[in-house]
Amino acid sequence: MKLETQYHGIIEYNENNIINLVKGMSGFENLKKFILVGIENNEVFSLFHSMEDKETAFIVSSPFYVKADYEVNLSEELVKELKIDSEKDVLIINTVNLSKDIKKMTTNLGAPIIININKHLGKQIIISDDEKMIKYPMIHS
C-alpha cells in the first residue's frame, strides 16, 4: 500500500506498519493512525507519520541514543490498555525538535510514545513536565 504525504513523497507500507494510538498525540488528539518509517541512511531518526493527515509527521528517535539510563515505569493500566505481555513487546520513541544548529536539537523525554509492536497499539504518555526533560539535548557538548 502507499501513503501520499505532503512533505515526504509516497511512503510504501503494509498493514503491519500501522500503529493505532489509543489516544492521539498531545495537540493532535484527533489523529490515531500512524506508521513508523525508517529514514534512509539514518539509524538514529525515524518518521512517525499520520495516516489520517498527509501533512502531519513527527521525527522520532529512541531515547536510549541520548540517555542510556532512560527509564519509563509503565502503569498496570497502560500495560492492560496496550495489551503488553512482555517487555520485549515494547518500543519507546520520543519526538525530536530539529534545528539548523545541530547542537540545538532536542528530544522530548518527558512525553514518550509507548508502542506494543506485536499488537500495533500505542500511546503517548506524560511522565515529566520538567523543561530539562521536555527539551533534552540530542548532543551534549
UniProtKB/Swiss-Prot annotation:
Pfam families: FliW
Keywords from the UniProt entry: Bacterial flagellum biogenesis, Chaperone, Cytoplasm, Translation regulation
Matching Gene3D superfamilies: BH3618-like
GO process terms (BP): bacterial-type flagellum assembly; regulation of translation
Alphabetized InterPro entries for the sequence: Flagellar_assembly_factor_FliW (IPR003775), Flagellar_assmbl_FliW_dom_sf (IPR024046)
Compartment(s) of residence: Cytoplasm
Domain of life: Bacteria
GO cellular component: cytoplasm
Functional summary from the UniProt entry: Acts as an anti-CsrA protein, binds CsrA and prevents it from repressing translation of its target genes, one of which is flagellin. Binds to flagellin and participates in the assembly of the flagellum.
PANTHER family in the cross-refs: FLAGELLAR ASSEMBLY FACTOR FLIW (PTHR39190:SF1)
Assembly and interaction partners: Interacts with translational regulator CsrA and flagellin(s).
Name this polypeptide is given: Flagellar assembly factor FliW
Organism in which the protein naturally occurs: Clostridium acetobutylicum (strain ATCC 824 / DSM 792 / JCM 1419 / IAM 19013 / LMG 5710 / NBRC 13948 / NRRL B-527 / VKM B-1787 / 2291 / W)
